[in-house]
Amino acid sequence: MGMSVTISAAAAEDAEQIFKLQYLAFQREAELYGNYLIQPLTQSLDSLKGELAADTVLVARLGDEVVGSVRGSVDEDGTGKITKLCVHPRLQGHGLGARLLRAVEEALAGGGGTVRFRLHTGHRSESNLRLYRKAGYTRVGGRTASDGVQLVILEKEAKDAADFAVSA
């Protein structure tokens, strides 16, 4: 009988596994853009530990192994910012990214002050864009990241997250 993947809040001791997973999972993005200086690949372990302490960080576990992760925070205007959603390459395409996305939306909305969710991905990242559109996100803009990648900015209203969770 196979193990199931569980999603929970990350602990400080998960930092190294998240760091390694992030580096592995974002290789395909770097290859897609021909740019290995994208922020998820250049982030330091200390910086990641700071995010673990300050933000909502969730992990997906298969046994003791971290196989997925996502981060989020809510700013003063009620925007839940979702970042660095990543899934181990061997588990991509099986719905784990969608589960992590729903879980972080629920966690960020739990405080009651979240009015919208915002995230971004590279303009060539079709699988990411498909995932986000399917989850109810729409394009609201774009910008060029400091590493030169053209980003697509997507949002959805927090109430849409509740509707999506009920209908999913």
Where are these regions (language model features)?
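Conserved acetyl-CoA-binding loop-helix of GNAT-fold acetyltransferases
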Residues: 87, 93-106, 130, 134
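Conserved beta-strand-loop-alpha-helix junction that forms the acyl-donor binding cleft
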Residues: 89, 118-129, 145-150
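Conserved GNAT acetyl-CoA-binding A-motif
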Residues: 108-121
